[in-house]
Amino acid sequence: MARYLGPKLKLSRREGTDLFLKSGVRAIESKCKIDNAPGQHGARRGRLSDYGVQLREKQKVRRMYGVLEKQFRNYYKEAARLKGNTGENLLQLLEQRLDNVVYRIGFASTRSEARQLVSHKAILVNGQVVNVPSFNVSADDVVSVREKAKKQARIVSALELAEQREKPTWIEVDSKKMEGTFKRVPERTDLSAEINEQLIVELYSK
């Protein structure tokens, strides 16, 4: 499946919630009609079946983290193999992606932008260049901006925006050094309450 390259706000409108695909700290309600789905008949949101609700939740989370369908299914399979709650395991695996950690630290204003920084070799993990967005970040790994990329306007701007966002408690950020230490894997209570991961588990369990 190809990566979606169309208008980002359209995806948020389709899911009826902010997927944080656009930069900035303004509420998404000020940018678009979030309660209406895109298209001519967007104002009419039909009642979904149980399967439809589960599918929408999966699509919402997949798009939020910018993961393709096959990748997402593989993450679910890995989450199911791990001990503990499958849904929580899934979210933790997604949170450990390097592109997501770069976004959480504040080097990028969106996960899509973070993915570009990683792919363009602007990011170091423990002092080594890593250009794989799906790279799994472990506890105590230090993620930083490569020296020659530190003056990039988009990174400087993203760090300024990040100061206005709630900082993740599981990452220690040093904005001056442009580095962040992934202290621990986030717990479920650290993450968005708007995600119902159990619906995804129910979908894939069929």
Swiss-Prot record:
GO terms for molecular function: rRNA binding; structural constituent of ribosome. One of its GO terms (cellular component) is small ribosomal subunit. Keywords: Ribonucleoprotein, Ribosomal protein, RNA-binding, rRNA-binding. PROSITE patterns: RIBOSOMAL_S4, S4. InterPro entries: Ribosomal_uS4, Ribosomal_uS4_bac-type, Ribosomal_uS4_CS, Ribosomal_uS4_N, S4_RNA-bd, S4_RNA-bd_sf. GO terms for biological process: ribosomal small subunit biogenesis; translation. Residues 96-156 form the S4 RNA-binding domain. CDD domains: S4. NCBIfam families: PRK05327.1, rpsD_bact. Belongs to the universal ribosomal protein uS4 family. One of the primary rRNA binding proteins, it binds directly to 16S rRNA where it nucleates assembly of the body of the 30S subunit. Part of the 30S ribosomal subunit. Contacts protein S5. The interaction surface between S4 and S5 is involved in control of translational fidelity. This is Small ribosomal subunit protein uS4. It comes from Pseudoalteromonas atlantica (strain T6c / ATCC BAA-1087).
